[in-house]
Amino acid sequence: MASLKKFLFLVLFLGMVSLSICDKEKREGENEEEEEEHEEESEEKRGLFSFLPKVIGVIGPLIHPPS
């Protein structure tokens, strides 16, 4: 009976450790995905802001022609 208790305790302990490791890896994966999404958004914003002055440079003279 004592050996059965030890065996069950060992199985339970190893299962909990395994779950803990899996949860940790899952959280790390989610964090990496969030960082990648944030980087993509930053690149899109930079692209927009680099393009915006060119558009203003073209439209500006059309709206306010030189006198």
From Swiss-Prot:
Spans annotated as Disordered: 24-48
Which InterPro entries does the protein's record reference? Frog_antimicrobial_propeptide, FSAP
- State where the protein is found: Secreted
Query: Does the keyword field hold Secreted?
Result: yes
**Signal peptide from the UniProt entry:** 1-22
State the disulfide connectivity: none
Protein name per its UniProtKB record = Preprofallaxidin-4
Task: Name one process (GO BP) from the record.
Answer: defense response
Its family? Belongs to the frog skin active peptide (FSAP) family. Dermaseptin subfamily.
Tissue specificity, per the record, is: Expressed by the skin glands.
Keywords of the record, alphabetical order, are: Amphibian defense peptide, Secreted, Signal
Q: What is its main location?
A: secreted
